[in-house]
């Protein structure tokens, strides 16, 4: 199930720092990447992952993420570097409505493996029937 996770923030008059450690995550961090310089009209993602879970946070800017479990879709608005969205494996993800200057940080519990991606929505619906 998707859930919001509050990240640890530290700060004083010099500025703020957000820390992400394995002990604070619902999984062990194996991969980290970020999406940036994305046009507002672009849709990123459009896939599901059989084995990878993810944590999404906008370290600057804002975007929306639609999560689909094969039966229902829910859209989340990310606009705080102090809050992250956890998305378990097996769900369809679409990231869109990127505000100019957005940097979307993504943490995963698996290294990249192209063979675990489901990029066809019809195939995803079949996957949900067999694994739901």
Language-model-detected regions and their locations in the chain:
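Non-catalytic, conserved peripheral segments adjacent to functional cores
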Residues: 1-85, 100-103, 107, 112-122, ...
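Beta-rich strand-turn-strand
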Residues: 92-96
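Short beta-strand-centered segments at strand-helix junctions
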Residues: 87-90
């Amino acid at each position: 199930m998707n859930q919001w996770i509050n990240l640890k923030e530290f700060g004083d008059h010099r500025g703020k720092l957000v820390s992400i450690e394995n002990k604070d995550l619902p999984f062990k961090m194996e991969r980290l990447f970020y999406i940036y310089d994305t046009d507002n009209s672009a849709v990123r993602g459009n896939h599901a992952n059989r084995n990878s879970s993810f944590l999404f946070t906008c370290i600057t800017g804002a975007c929306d993420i639609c999560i689909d479990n094969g039966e229902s879709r829910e859209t989340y608005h990310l606009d705080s570097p102090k809050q992250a969205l956890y998305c378990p494996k097996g769900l369809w993800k679409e990231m869109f409505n990127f505000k100019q200057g957005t940097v979307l940080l993504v943490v995963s519990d698996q290294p990249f493996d192209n063979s675990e991606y489901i990029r066809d929505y019809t195939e995803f619906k079949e996957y949900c029937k067999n694994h739901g």
